[in-house]
């Protein structure tokens, strides 16, 4: 890729700035970290690797990057694409081979959504591999839109106010997941991916299925944004401004102990003298 135009340069700077803010806000990367960057072959993970490699050059701290892709043995998966790309970049990488495709096809009936099971199997394998190579952080390519969509998916279908945190300690306690693109917009990532001409690998197992719940939510949010620009930005800010006393979760707030504060100043108003 040659010299960037003014708009292309602004796009690159915006992505790097927003990712840098997220990394700083949540203390995602520290001195001496070994960051395992999970690559799927999609636009998000390519952009993530690109941004983190830039940070590695300019950040005031030292950290290592290891790129990891999981070959799930999907039919037609172009095994040569990622190794060739990563060799050209000169970044350390590993290809983890595990046939989760057969497991998913065996357990999920034809026509049903495979994404959830596929994701769980992939996550477990990557957690194990991160532990094996001594990675201190596992970087995923989820962005701002993913986080908002996940919030609504959990609310609509799981009855929970839960999204994707920018930083998370896994249930096993041995892995810390970071999402440096948490503040970045999907449209910017798509534009940057097109600009950089990343060798995109489509997901033939789940990405082509129609009527997935996530796509329904995505379409809903796009429609909201068209009708009321700025609504999704407000939703994202709300995820950073939680007020437990204004909800109804007794595990987060002890409503049972609420009493009148006898020491509080009186709010009596003398109506006669007004």
Curated annotation (Swiss-Prot):
EC class of the enzyme, as a word: transferase
Cofactor annotation comment: Binds 1 [4Fe-4S] cluster per subunit. The cluster is chelated by three Cys residues, the fourth Fe has a free coordination site that may bind a sulfur atom transferred from the persulfide of IscS.
Pathway terms, separated by semicolons: tRNA modification
InterPro entries per the UniProt record, alphabetical: Rossmann-like_a/b/a_fold, TilS/TtcA_N, tRNA_Cyd_32_2_STrfase, tRNA_thiolation_TtcA_Ctu1
Disulfide bond positions: none
Source organism, top-level taxon: Bacteria
Signal peptide from the UniProt entry: none
Main localisation: cytoplasm
Cofactor or coenzyme needed: Mg(2+); [4Fe-4S] cluster
Residue interval(s) of motif PP-loop motif: 40-45
GO BP: any one term: tRNA thio-modification
Subcellular location: Cytoplasm
Name of a matching Pfam family: ATP_bind_3
Catalytic function, reaction form: cytidine(32) in tRNA + S-sulfanyl-L-cysteinyl-[cysteine desulfurase] + AH2 + ATP = 2-thiocytidine(32) in tRNA + L-cysteinyl-[cysteine desulfurase] + A + AMP + diphosphate + H(+)
EC number(s) per entry: 2.8.1.-
GO molecular function (one): sulfurtransferase activity
Keywords associated with the record: 4Fe-4S, ATP-binding, Cytoplasm, Iron, Iron-sulfur, Magnesium, Metal-binding, Nucleotide-binding, RNA-binding, Transferase, tRNA processing, tRNA-binding
GO CC aspect terms: cytoplasm
Residues annotated as binding [4Fe-4S] cluster: 115, 118, 206
Annotated family: Belongs to the TtcA family.
Note: The thiolation reaction likely consists of two steps: a first activation step by ATP to form an adenylated intermediate of the target base of tRNA, and a second nucleophilic substitution step of the sulfur (S) atom supplied by the hydrosulfide attached to the Fe-S cluster.
Role, per record: Catalyzes the ATP-dependent 2-thiolation of cytidine in position 32 of tRNA, to form 2-thiocytidine (s(2)C32). The sulfur atoms are provided by the cysteine/cysteine desulfurase (IscS) system.
Oligomeric and partner information: Homodimer.
HAMAP family in UniProt: TtcA
Protein name as annotated: tRNA-cytidine(32) 2-sulfurtransferase
The species this protein was found in: Pseudomonas syringae pv. tomato (strain ATCC BAA-871 / DC3000)
Lineage: Bacteria, Pseudomonadati, Pseudomonadota, Gammaproteobacteria, Pseudomonadales
């Amino acid at each position: 890729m040659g010299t960037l135009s003014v708009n292309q340069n602004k796009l690159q700077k915006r992505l790097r700035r927003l990712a840098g803010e997220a990394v700083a806000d949540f203390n995602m990367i520290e001195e001496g970290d070994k960051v395992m960057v999970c690559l799927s072959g999609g636009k998000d993970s390519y952009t993530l690797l690109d941004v983190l490699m830039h940070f590695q050059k300019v950040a005031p701290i030292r950290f290592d990057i290891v790129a990891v892709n999981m070959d799930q043995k999907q039919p037609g998966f172009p095994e040569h694409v990622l190794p060739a790309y990563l060799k050209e970049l000169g970044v350390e990488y590993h290809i983890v081979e595990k046939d989760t495709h057969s497991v998913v096809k065996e357990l999920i009936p034809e026509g049903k959504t495979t994404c959830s099971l596929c994701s769980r199997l992939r996550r477990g394998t990557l957690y194990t591999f991160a532990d094996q190579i001594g990675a201190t952080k596992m970087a995923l390519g989820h962005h701002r839109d993913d986080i908002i969509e996940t919030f609504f998916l959990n609310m609509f279908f799981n009855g929970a106010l839960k999204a994707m945190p920018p930083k998370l300690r896994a249930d096993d306690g041995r892995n810390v997941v970071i999402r440096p693109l948490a503040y970045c917009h999907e449209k910017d990532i798509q534009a940057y991916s097109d600009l950089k001409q990343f060798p995109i690998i489509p997901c033939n197992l789940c990405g082509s299925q129609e009527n997935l719940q996530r796509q329904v939510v995505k379409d809903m949010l796009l429609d909201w944004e068209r009708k009321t620009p700025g609504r999704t930005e407000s939703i994202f800010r709300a995820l950073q401004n939680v007020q437990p006393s204004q909800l109804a979760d007794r595990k987060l707030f002890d409503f049972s102990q609420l009493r009148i504060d006898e020491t509080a100043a009186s709010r009596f108003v003398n109506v006669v003298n007004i």
